[in-house]
């Protein structure tokens, strides 16, 4: 299993993450969603480098050219609702791919304690395909684990890519312990801890609320 920390490469990606974190800039919902989408586009490009390539010959107006292109069948999956703009970023690049959606939410027992519930899944067959699961925030890793297990009811993928914008170190360690060896984890930023409410610190707040408004 490989963990790829894209933020450590000091690229323009870090500006998108910085704007999402900034308490003033993040209040612009359109810009916040677009920055999530941009990170998805960057990660889609990086993930494509890991895929099996096929050389195809195409005819141009002046002759023929050989082009190396990814040949894997890809399924893009995300966890609703915060994952939607992230998913759109991936879909902008993997526009030919199939899509899957999982609904996961926190069911609180009291102010601090909760369980993660999976309520809805819509997915094609993922057998022998490359599965990319995107969720902008990876706080504990529990939602990602349950989403993956739910998707396994639709087949066994060839390879799994876990994509997140900000993850806690705890979540990265947890995912490494519960996911199979044919998994690659992609992170834009790794933060040191989570608070008593299981929010990433320093993080950026509630990504779903920032993108779409507060929920009741």
UniProtKB/Swiss-Prot annotation:
Tell me what reaction this enzyme catalyses: UMP + diphosphate = 5-phospho-alpha-D-ribose 1-diphosphate + uracil
Q: Which controlled-vocabulary keywords does the entry list?
A: Allosteric enzyme, Glycosyltransferase, GTP-binding, Magnesium, Nucleotide-binding, Transferase
Q: Which cofactor does it need?
A: Mg(2+)
Domain of life of the organism encoding this protein: Bacteria
MF terms (GO), sorted A to Z? GTP binding; uracil phosphoribosyltransferase activity
Listed pathway(s): Pyrimidine metabolism; UMP biosynthesis via salvage pathway; UMP from uracil: step 1/1
| InterPro entries per UniProt | PRibTrfase_dom, PRTase-like
Give the UniProt family note.
Answer: Belongs to the UPRTase family.
**Per its database record, what is this protein's job?**
Catalyzes the conversion of uracil and 5-phospho-alpha-D-ribose 1-diphosphate (PRPP) to UMP and diphosphate.
For this protein, the record's NCBIfam families field holds: PRK00129.1
What is this protein's name? Uracil phosphoribosyltransferase
Which organism is the protein's source?
Porphyromonas gingivalis (strain ATCC BAA-308 / W83)
């Amino acid at each position: 299993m490989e963990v790829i920390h894209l933020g450590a490469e000091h690229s323009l990606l870090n500006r998108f993450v910085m704007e999402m974190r900034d308490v003033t800039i993040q209040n612009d919902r359109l810009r916040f969603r677009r920055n999530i989408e941009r990170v998805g586009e960057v990660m889609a490009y990086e993930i494509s480098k890991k895929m099996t390539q096929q050389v195809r010959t195409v005819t141009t107006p002046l002759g023929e050219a050989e082009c190396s292109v990814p040949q894997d069948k890809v399924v893009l999956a995300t966890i609703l609702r915060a994952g939607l703009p992230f998913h759109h970023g991936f879909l902008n690049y993997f526009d030919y791919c199939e899509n899957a959606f999982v609904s996961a939410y926190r069911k609180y027992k009291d102010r601090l304690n909760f369980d993660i519930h999976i309520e809805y899944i819509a997915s094609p067959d993922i057998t022998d395909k490359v599965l990319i699961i995107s969720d902008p925030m990876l706080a504990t890793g529990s939602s990602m684990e349950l989403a993956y297990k739910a998707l396994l009811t639709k087949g066994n993928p060839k390879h799994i890519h876990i994509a997140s914008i900000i993850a806690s170190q705890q979540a990265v360690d947890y995912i490494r312990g519960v996911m199979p060896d044919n998994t690659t984890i992609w992170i834009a930023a790794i933060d040191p801890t989570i608070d008593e409410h299981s929010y990433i610190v320093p993080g950026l707040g509630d990504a779903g609320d920032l993108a779409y408004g507060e929920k009741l």
